Design a protein with these regions (language model features):
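Non-catalytic, usually N-terminal nucleic-acid engagement modules in DNA/RNA processing proteins
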Residues: 1-192
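Glycine-rich phosphate/ribose-binding loops and adjacent secondary-structure elements
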Residues: 23, 192-322
Length: 322
């Protein structure tokens, strides 16, 4: 059972509740990106460097958390099938990881937040598939969904072909067409998903988004709101530092959704966080995901707020009320 209820509005901004089976997520919400499998074994929370530290907070490791409960920071998390091969694992270990859903491992059995399983389109398109120490796997829509479902997710999204600012017009259209074909195949397998199915669209401005939606609608056998539970706007990461472009993209996507009768679907913005989030919420975004917090931690930076970071040695932890 999937539903999205708007509980408050102010202009295009809205506060909502995303209900997926027995889990509820308050929006707006930022899904922190987590790599559940980082090359290690279960006793070490499957390793993964700084990812392991984050998982220690998620799994309530008292030695790390000092007995504090940080579960509200993990009401919903994002993971990607492409991250399974980030640490050069062997094929046997990949198969072992996928033998159990994430929550079926003892170390994650108490985790009750939502898991958003991304298709890994950007990395897969760039690398040509999943590559480990002794394997190379071509990934198409069916294989991507099979792996996503092995993770036991609450939200899945179709395998997409992100566009890039340097792409020629013909290349952008070709990628949009490939994404549309994948979306149609994804919709055909809708009944296999015990959760929410999100549709990926691409574009920085209205004409691009209009073409993206048109191509998808031409491929689908049913209206978008009958096949999908949410919209995910992609291809914005290369433009992440241009707030004006981000605002235009989200605003135009929201307008397209309204014109096509999709305004009741939640809108997720892939790979974007930071100081743009309040503005993007103001023009209609409901959820986000990002690994920026990890990159900042690796680089020794502490987020004072959405707009400012300081070196970790200069941080005043007493000023944080979280």
């Amino acid at each position: 059972m999937v539903s999205f209820d708007v509980v408050a509005e102010a202009g295009e901004a809205r506060r909502g509740q995303l209900q997926i089976n027995d889990r509820t997520l308050e929006t707006p919400h930022l899904f922190p990106v987590i790599n559940f499998y980082g090359g290690g074994n279960e006793g070490a929370l499957f390793g993964g460097g700084v990812h392991r530290t984050i998982k220690e907070f998620l799994a309530h490791d008292n030695e790390v958390t000092g007995g504090e409960d940080y579960s509200d920071l993990f009401d919903g998390v994002m993971t990607s099938i492409s991250s399974l091969a980030d640490y050069g694992i062997r094929e046997k270990k990949l198969e072992w990881y996928l033998d159990n859903e994430i929550r079926e491992w003892d170390c994650f059995s108490d985790y009750d937040g939502m898991i958003f399983a991304d298709s890994g389109g950007y990395k897969i398109l760039k690398q040509g598939g999943l590559e480990g120490e002794d394997f190379e796997k071509d990934i198409d829509q069916d294989k991507a969904l099979d792996i996503q479902l092995d993770l036991g997710p609450d939200i899945v999204v179709n395998l997409d072909h992100p566009i890039h600012p340097d792409d020629e017009f013909e290349e952008r259209i070709e990628k949009m067409e490939q994404t549309a074909v994948n979306a149609a195949r994804f919709a055909e397998r809708r009944d296999e998903v015990d959760g929410a199915c999100y549709l990926t669209v691409h574009g920085y401005y209205e004409a691009m988004l209009e073409r993206s939606f048109d191509l998808i609608e031409e491929e689908l056998a049913e209206p978008v709101p009958e096949a999908f539970d949410g919209i995910a706007l992609g291809s914005l990461v290369p433009r992440k530092d241009n707030v004006e472009v981000l605002v235009e993209a989200v605003s135009d996507c929201k307008r397209e959704m309204q014109q096509r009768g999709y305004e009741n679907l939640p809108l997720h913005v892939l790979g974007i966080s930071g100081n743009a989030m309040p503005l993007l919420v103001a023009v209609g975004a409901d959820t986000f995901d990002s690994a920026s917090y990890l990159h900042q931690a690796i680089n020794g930076k502490y987020c004072v707020n959405l707009f400012e970071t300081v070196p970790i040695d200069d941080a005043n932890f007493d000023a944080c009320e979280c």
